[in-house]
């Protein structure tokens, strides 16, 4: 008998992956956590039935959420990651010897424990001495620091459930205050393709552009996320993501990547017309 994992992307569209076995299933204080093993995508993690990462394609997400801002701000030393309990974003950050301190704020300790046991390819880095894990609500955590971080990465789940507070005006305003003058915020910006996802993306974008003087969006292809077409947000007080960036300096670091490169970095900010139109619909008119 075949065993399939199926996720509903819209009322009329589903993603299905054949599964060899289920490695873990548990209920934390916040959500249901499952880990499966599949022939095509290797091990994968779901939260409340929604795909978070697979061993086969997680490198795309984690490289693009990390190396884009680090290329723009190579002097970044003090980093805040909100969410990201699987460890993939932290793993990529730790490839930069210049980074001295990473605060990882994850609301659900069980996510970290499960990933450490079943997804060591992303989570084994969490024991690094530069990483400081805080098991608390990111919305609450970010109220405290002022002018503290060079980079904030909002590696959150979708805008419902435990991560819901990470999509509010209050949250983005506090991120702005927590950043240094030349700081950058990166957030996973949802998908522009299916109507329900696009609406969530627009609401988020509207709140960010009201909190930051400069905000751009870049795109990436992630096969196991709804539609495969995914966005990240790049927001800052004054830095630009392409103009004036010293790409040669990043290349000189010799960091070996599987998805990210400096040509792709620049190209990712060129968006399809339908995405530009959805973003412009919620941006302030000048």
List each model region and its residues:
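SAM/dcSAM-binding transferase cores
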Residues: 1-34, 206, 227-286
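The AdoMet/dcAdoMet-binding core of the Class I SAM-like
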Residues: 2-4, 53-182, 194-201, 224, ...
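Active-site proximal loops enriched in glycine and acidic residues that flank catalytic Cys/His/Asp
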Residues: 189, 219-221
């Amino acid at each position: 008998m075949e065993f399939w994992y199926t996720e509903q992307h819209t009322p009329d569209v589903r993603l299905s992956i054949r599964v060899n076995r289920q490695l873990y299933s548990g209920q934390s204080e916040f959500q249901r956590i499952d880990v499966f093993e599949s022939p095509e995508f290797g091990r994968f993690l779901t939260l409340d039935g929604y795909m978070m990462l697979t061993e086969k394609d997680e490198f795309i997400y984690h490289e693009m959420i990390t190396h884009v801002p680090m290329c723009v701000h190579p002097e970044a030393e003090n980093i805040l990651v909100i969410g990201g309990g699987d460890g993939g974003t932290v793993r990529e950050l730790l490839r930069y010897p210049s980074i001295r301190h990473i605060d990882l704020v994850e609301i659900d300790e069980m996510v970290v424990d499960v990933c450490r046991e079943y997804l060591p390819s992303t989570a084994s880095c969490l024991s690094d001495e530069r990483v400081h894990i805080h098991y608390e609500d990111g919305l609450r955590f970010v109220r405290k620091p002022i002018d503290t971080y060079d980079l904030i990465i909002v590696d959150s789940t979708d805008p419902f459930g435990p991560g819901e507070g990470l999509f509010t005006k209050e949250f983005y305003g506090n991120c702005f205050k927590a950043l240094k003058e030349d700081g950058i915020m990166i957030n996973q910006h949802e998908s522009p393709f299916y109507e329900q996802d696009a609406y969530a993306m627009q609401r988020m974008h509207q709140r960010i552009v009201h909190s930051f003087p400069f905000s751009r969006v870049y795109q990436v292809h992630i096969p196991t996320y709804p539609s495969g077409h995914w966005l990240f947000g790049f927001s800052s007080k004054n830095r630009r993501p392409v103009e004036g960036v010293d790409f040669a300096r990043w290349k000189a670091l010799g960091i070996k990547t599987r998805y990210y490169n400096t040509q792709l970095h620049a190209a990712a900010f060129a968006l399809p017309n339908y995405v530009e139109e959805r973003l412009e619909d919620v941006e302030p008119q000048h």
